[in-house]
Amino acid sequence: MKQIIQDLKKGDTILEEVPAPRVKYGSVLIQTTRTLVSLGTERMLVDFGKANFIQKAKQQPDKVKMVLDKVKTDGLRPTLEAVFNKLGQPLPLGYCNVGKVVEVGKGVTEYSVGDRVASNGHHAEYVCVPKNLVAKIPDNVTDEEAAFTVIGSIGLQGIRLLQPTFGETIVVVGLGLIGLVTAELLLANGCNVIGFDFDPNKVKIAKEKGIIAINPSEGTNQVKFVESYTNNIGADGVIITASNKSNEIISQSANMCRKRGRIILVGVIGLDISRADFFEKEITFQVSCSYGAGRYDEEYEQK
């Protein structure tokens, strides 16, 4: 079968011919009909692969510390061999998959052959996915629409953590795919939604969906706009779906909030937080983990 993989050592993105997976206990084998490319996450992986070793190290300083610790315990040569072996392993891309179940593993009673399902499977003709990371697709939902399921669940988890109530004013910073979906979900929840993005095309799409969308590069001060909109009270909450290394985003988000406002980070930004920005308003800050409870928990995902 064909599968898209990323070579982290050379930086190449390859359509590779690989063996089809076999169904495992507690999993289902899915024949793919659609996959969705997540530009932010997958572009980040591609850019990481294209970077040289020094650039890779700068992008992942926490991993550098792990390597240095390993050098101290195992020595330089074994450590370098381990690093090169790790980078040499092909990385499957993609996590928004739609298809039909073609085989059901032992221990699975929730799904049957022929079911249309959405999952976090890769860009591949066939994927084997644990049952808890699979969901049936309603008959009135197309495959193209269902391909956005995982993207939507990432935004939805940020909203769960924020716990917005009807009529609250929520700011979404970053109107990429996840940001737009998050903003729409907030609108459906009865919130007043303000969105910020520097891309005029994304701002245009957001406005068409009923979001109060602003492009700061056109001269609008984000903090002052929120203050004006809320009669100098501030936003009840901010969800950050942007991807940017700057620390300015977290500072601006705090300044947009009212006293005891909430900030949820869904994206990836600089986090050199100023105590003063959070102290006087007693602002709550939390990082959202992927698409919710159970993610990265082996007991939930694999058993």
Where do the language-model regions lie?
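A glycine-/small-residue-rich N-terminal strand-loop-strand element
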Residues: 78-89, 96-120
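Residue-level marker of beta-strand positions
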Residues: 34, 115-116, 126, 169, ...
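A structural motif shared across PLP-dependent enzymes of the aminotransferase-like
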Residues: 92-95, 120-132
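Conserved acidic E/D residue at the C-terminus of a beta-strand in Rossmann-like folds
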Residues: 121, 197-198, 289
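Mid-domain Rossmann-like dinucleotide-binding core that forms the NAD(H)/NADP(H) cofactor-binding site
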Residues: 116, 145-219
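Glycine-rich cofactor phosphate-binding loops and adjacent beta1-alpha1 units
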Residues: 204, 209-288, 294
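Short N-terminal strand-loop motif that marks the start
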Residues: 1-85, 89, 121
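Short, well-ordered loop/turn sites that connect or cap secondary structure elements
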Residues: 111-112, 164, 257
